[in-house]
Structures are given as structure tokens and as C-alpha cells.
Amino acid sequence: MPAPTQLFFPLIRNCELSRIYGTACYCHHKHLCCSSSYIPQSRLRYTPHPAYATFCRPKENWWQYTQGRRYASTPQKFYLTPPQVNSILKANEYSFKVPEFDGKNVSSILGFDSNQLPANAPIEDRRSAATCLQTRGMLLGVFDGHAGCACSQAVSERLFYYIAVSLLPHETLLEIENAVESGRALLPILQWHKHPNDYFSKEASKLYFNSLRTYWQELIDLNTGESTDIDVKEALINAFKRLDNDISLEAQVGDPNSFLNYLVLRVAFSGATACVAHVDGVDLHVANTGDSRAMLGVQEEDGSWSAVTLSNDHNAQNERELERLKLEHPKSEAKSVVKQDRLLGLLMPFRAFGDVKFKWSIDLQKRVIESGPDQLNDNEYTKFIPPNYHTPPYLTAEPEVTYHRLRPQDKFLVLATDGLWETMHRQDVVRIVGEYLTGMHHQQPIAVGGYKVTLGQMHGLLTERRTKMSSVFEDQNAATHLIRHAVGNNEFGTVDHERLSKMLSLPEELARMYRDDITIIVVQFNSHVVGAYQNQE
């Protein structure tokens, strides 16, 4: 691999190709695909399209996959023990603390915690975090894949490079291009902060690098170097749109390498939403495409917590999105463009990367499939044309960008895929994280809501909490603590170990019926530094 390619796309470690590129089940709640996929209870009345039924191949004898686990058991019940639960919850957790200089942290970010809990096998969510080295700021993002993990994997590897390049001044772009031309080593533009299980595709790194290079060459040609001001919002939008365009173009052109040729097609025909935050001092930008969310945790003067939404879901619950779609297509399609709260009756998010089945013309789809590998040509999903498909594209990857200037009371930011937001209210998310970060969790009164609780039940709740007073400290990661509550909370808002154990014991075919993949990043802000910015004005 050429040196410049290696510098831009570091190889974390060799990965299991079967885990990354093996046959993926094209089954996800984002697509109305089959009855065994995860579909929220309120949407179960919708009938799947027959063409999707062939993509769900539940493993036979699922019980065999549990034989390696040890269970605490009763004659009829099998529960994971608390240590086993912790092992599952903490398997994918990652924490990063911003390094100090001379004993001081001069960044507006103290650090972040992240974690993932799969429901699909393999998990279709991805996450990324990186520090921009040639400019200022940090990038953090969550990516929710559907119809497989190929697109979310590619976007998680590539999007931050496109954003970083979009933020670079003209002279830096020229320096990078000259270094590549002359074969000289160049400084990396990103410092990645990744869990050991997060990976880069070494097979596709050269292809990805060449597409990125073409992008910065075009930026050099477009920019004469006269203007030094870079609009972060515009850079984010351009990066999202350009990456999606490259994903589409790579699939159309193909690759002489059969492995890469199949890979780029899988990336293009699957899809992914993205929610990305760029933090530079007190300037916070959130770019969102799809239905993942960014939530700001604000601590009020009385110590209470409030949630400030920094992103909008791009789905049928968003009236502006519905109006946008209807305006982009003829009036004759007003009743068909969104059916049963889904794009063309099939796709839940109205914005996403990939998903070329909702972007390409029918002729282009047929031409690419017919000239593609046998695995693609034999796949009923790729050959299926959505109903009422008259005026593509119906889908865009253009993000909606929100700006927020940080204040001392802004304590943290939660980025999470919809697997979290479908199980917890935003205010509960912020309260749980806030109490965790301030160590106040065990001091809060037990909330029983409108339930009638007997004295014996209350005694049981108090006893349970007393034995678990250290639970807040048994989780050293805020994202892990949040997942524990998202999966294990009972009607009283406390973690029920029996419920948590049951949910984590479900085989993958059942897990998807109860919840989605969950990916969370919790970013903690440095109130002292943020306050200093404010005082300088």
C-alpha cells in the first residue's frame, strides 16, 4: 500500500472478512422487509412486501449458540448472572480523555464515552471519533445501517476524512497534493479514537483514498486561495453529499478486483443514517441525516437537568420532511411517495447514505445489476423495484446542520442511534447521564408515578437500591450506564436485573423483535474552558 494511503487510512488490525463482508441478512426495521425483523409495536400492522421474505434466514437450533454460556438457573428459567451481564454490556465500551498540558485541559471537551449493544448479527450500527490535526476541533458520529452493515461501515471510515478535507484551507490542500505527487510522507489529518474491535477495510483503502484525492483536487481547482474563511456548515453539507455521490459512482463504475466490485455494490445497495458533531471551542455543529439524534444535557441553576434537541428526525413524524418530499415530486405522487409512514411504503428514514434503489433510475439499476457479480444478480432484494417508482431520486444524504454556541451550563452531548430513542424519552436520557456524571444517582428518590405501591413493595425497592448503590460506580462508562437503563429499566425507572438478564439472553432472531442495535457517544464538556471563552467576549 502506498505510504500516503496508509497515512490517511490507518490499518487498525486484520479483521475477519466473514464478519465484515460475509452474507448479511437484509432485514432491518428501517426497511419493511419481513415479519421477523425488528418493527416497533405501533407498526406491526404493516404487511411486509413478499420480495423481502427471502432475506431472513433465521439460524436453526438457536439454542446451540447459548451453550457456551453459564447461567444461574431455576427449573424453568435461565438468567445471566450479574458478572455475565456486565461482560456483555462492557464488551464494546470505549473511553477517551483529552490529554492535559502542564496539568491543564485547554479543550472545551473533557472526553467522551461510547458503547454499542447489538441486536442484529452482525451489528449494523457504527461509531467514529477523531481529532482534526490540521485544523481545530473534534468529530464524533454514530451511523445506523440498514439492509446490512456495508454502508454504515464505509461511511464510518470515510465521512470524517471528507469533512476534514472540506475544512482545510487552500494552501494546506496544495501541500497535501504536492506531497502525494512527489511520493513524500504527509502528516495525517485525523487522529482516530477507536475501540479495538472497530476496524478499517484495508482492501478498500486505496479505492477510498483515490476518491478522496479526487475530491480535494476539485476543491483546489474551485478555490483560488483568495478566501481564508471556511463555513463549517457548508463544509459539513458538502462532505456528506460528496461521499454519497462517490459511493454511488464507485458502484456504477465497478472495480476489476472481484472482491472490491462486490463490496462497492453492497455499500451502495445497503444504507446508513448519520449523526455527526463537530466541536471547535464553543462552536458546536451537528449534521444529521436520518433518524439518529443529538441531545444536549443542560444543568439548570437549581441542579435539575433539561434536554435540548440539536437534530430533527427525517421521517414521517417530521411535517417539514413530508412537505419537502411532496414538493420534490409531481402532485400525482402525493399519495404514494409516503405510504404507511415510509418512503414509497418501504423505508423509514427520508434521508440516508447509499440506498441507491431509491436514487437511481430503473434503467441504471438494471444495467448495474446485470453487469454485476452473480451474488448481486441472484439477489431478489437488489432486483426488486420499489412500487410507484416514477421520478427518482426519492432519497438524499444531504444533512440538516444545527449550530449551538456552548455555555457553561451545557454539560454533555448524547449522540445515539434510534435504538436508544425508541426505548427512552429524551428527558430520561439526559437525567440518567447527568446524575451519573455528578454522582447523584443513588441519592434520588424512587419515582413510582401513578402506581399503587404497598409498603412491602416499597421496602423491596429500597432494599434493592441499597444493594445496588454502587451500580453507578460499577459502570465506568456513561454510555454503558445508559444502555443498562435502556434495556433493563422497569416501570419505576430503576434497573431490574431480571429484566436486563432476559433481554440480553434473547437469541438474535428474537432480540431484533424487541429492540434495535444501540450505539451511544456521551461527550462531556469542560465548563471552565467554555466559561473562559464567554468571559473573553
UniProtKB/Swiss-Prot annotation:
Transit peptide: 1-71
Assigned EC number: 3.1.3.43
Cellular-component GO terms for this entry: mitochondrial matrix; mitochondrion; pyruvate dehydrogenase (lipoamide) phosphatase complex
Top-level taxon: Eukaryota
Subunit structure: Heterodimer of a catalytic (PDP1) and a regulatory (PDPR) subunit.
Domain PPM-type phosphatase residue range list: 109-525
CDD domains: PP2Cc (cd00143)
SUPFAM superfamilies in the record: PP2C-like
Species in which this protein is naturally found: Homo sapiens
MF GO annotations: [pyruvate dehydrogenase (acetyl-transferring)]-phosphatase activity; metal ion binding; protein serine/threonine phosphatase activity
Keywords annotated in UniProt: Acetylation, Calcium, Disease variant, Hydrolase, Magnesium, Manganese, Metal-binding, Mitochondrion, Protein phosphatase, Transit peptide
Record protein name field: [Pyruvate dehydrogenase [acetyl-transferring]]-phosphatase 1, mitochondrial
Disulphide-bridged cysteine pairs: none
Family, as annotated: Belongs to the PP2C family.
